[in-house]
Amino acid sequence: MRRPVIAGNWKMHMTCAQAREFMAAFLPLVADMPNDRDLVLAPPFTALSSMADLCKDSPIALSSQNVHWEGSGAFTGEISPSMLKEHGVTYTIVGHSEPRKYFSESDEQINHRARSSQANGLIPIVCVGETDEQRERGEAERVIRRQIEQGLEGLDADLLVVAYEPIWAIGTGKTCEAAEANRICGLIRSWVGSPDLVIQYGGSVKGGNIDELMGMSDIDGVLVGGASLQPDGFARIANYNVA
């Protein structure tokens, strides 16, 4: 039985003070959240310590927004799995389209990050997705399959989450039709060959489309960007209801 994972990625938003203000408003809104799902927040590294305290005795698990594959060393600006675990982190986001685009992250590097996460008891959320140009050229499936085959090599499918995020839908207000997102998620499941693999959808997820998305047979959760920055909006997503 696949357990849904609802995750919010704060990206480069929220100081510690802002995180505390958010949580003061958000926690009461998810106090009665159904217990058939997992709720995850990925704050900036600087807010992890504060968030670890704020999330105690709550249904919220913490994720990092990235992780390095080495345990220590001369890797300026990076952070190791053990450093994250010290702050109560249980998930790591790897392969997001922004580091792929802005820092030229390769599928091989993403695989190293994901494998290091699993080796250290963390659950990687591995992001995959196509650009608008690739979609228009009919290359979406080929691109995503390559990302899956190279990015997930050597990983335990029972200890990871895959997030399908069509890049053209991230932060644009454009949303992939639920049926099409479901079709791609189903393809990913077949390529990996694991019926129990948890697969999220990400890309302009909001309160107005969460129920439809979560009603799809192959969508097991969402990875939320901008809508996770507002307590009311993200609480609506966390408390989704599938009729």
Curated annotation (Swiss-Prot):
Keyword Cytoplasm recorded: yes
Catalytic activity, reaction form: D-glyceraldehyde 3-phosphate = dihydroxyacetone phosphate
CDD domains the UniProt entry points to: TIM
Compartments, as annotated in UniProt: Cytoplasm
Gene Ontology process terms (BP): gluconeogenesis; glyceraldehyde-3-phosphate biosynthetic process; glycerol catabolic process; glycolytic process
Key words of the record: Cytoplasm, Gluconeogenesis, Glycolysis, Isomerase
Disulfide pairings: none
Pathway: Carbohydrate biosynthesis; gluconeogenesis; Carbohydrate degradation; glycolysis; D-glyceraldehyde 3-phosphate from glycerone phosphate: step 1/1
Record-annotated active site: H96 (electrophile), E165 (proton acceptor)
One Pfam family hit: TIM
Record's function text: Involved in the gluconeogenesis. Catalyzes stereospecifically the conversion of dihydroxyacetone phosphate (DHAP) to D-glyceraldehyde-3-phosphate (G3P).
Subunit structure: Homodimer.
Protein family according to the UniProt entry: Belongs to the triosephosphate isomerase family.
Name of the protein this chain belongs to: Triosephosphate isomerase
Organism: Synechococcus sp. (strain CC9902)
